[in-house]
Each structure stands twice: as C-alpha cells, then as structure tokens.
Amino acid sequence: MQPHPDRGKIVVNCAVITVSDTRSHLTDKSGQLIQQLLLNASRAVGYYTIIKDEPTQITSQLQALNNIDVVIFNGGTGIAPRDTTYDAIASLLDKTLPGFGELFRYLSYQEIGSRAIASRAICGVYQNILVFSLPGSSNAVKLAMEQLILPEIEHLVSQLRA
C-alpha cells in the first residue's frame, strides 16, 4: 500500500521549546539539534525558548503561539516527579496521534532496549497546531526528527490545512 501523494512543497513555520530546569541557550544541545534539523530540511524556525518544567509555563507557551504550524517540545517526558510536559500538553490536545508515541517507543526499543517504556513522547493537535513532545536526550531527538517528524511534517500540516 502506497501513501497518497501530497500536493507539493508548503511553508511550515515551527517553534522549538525546551523544557528544563537546568538548560541554558548555551547548553541546550537538543533544542539546538531540533532547530538545525528543521533548517536543514528547509523548515522555518520562528520561535525558540527554554522554559522551566512547570505545567503552567508549558501550557501558557503553547496557548500563546501565533503563526506557528508545528511546535516541538523537548524535555520532561519521563516519569520523574519534575517531568510534567506530557501531562500539561495532553490536557490541551484536541486530537492525539497515538501512532507517533507507539512508533517512537518501538524505534527507541531497537536502540536502548526495554528502557523505552519510560518514554511518554506524544503528538497531537492543539487549535490546528501540530504538537510534538520529545525526550530531552539528543539521541532521542535525532531519532524522532529523522525517522518520524521530518518525513511526515509536510503531510500532517497539509492535512490540518485541508
């Protein structure tokens, strides 16, 4: 079975938000990696910030975004007490794409084994914005971006615009 073809190249405006109590713009390797991979794929990065792992900061950042098609959060998806990104984002999503988390954990399992069960990576739609939430690990970010997000970003945004 072949996927149906897309209409052609579209402009995709992205935001990158790192959720961390310890990272700075100098030490945020995963946030920088996401931006670089987006730019290498000819995707615009219109917004980048680092916020604390506080549910109110996470939800207010998502609610305040304008003129953004895709937002990629990284950090705070595990099960430690301060890992609140999943819960904050999941509470706002209008629709979820469970296949993203399922495939991400499957691909992670191939690389790191059973520790993949601790990941709460998620994807969904909030007010017509495609939202991804990834672990803070640069290896996890690279895996998600290269194998899942970048190959499908244009198609998913096209679906939201249809």
Please annotate each region the language model reported.
Residues 1-162:
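Non-catalytic beta/alpha edge segments that cap or flank active sites
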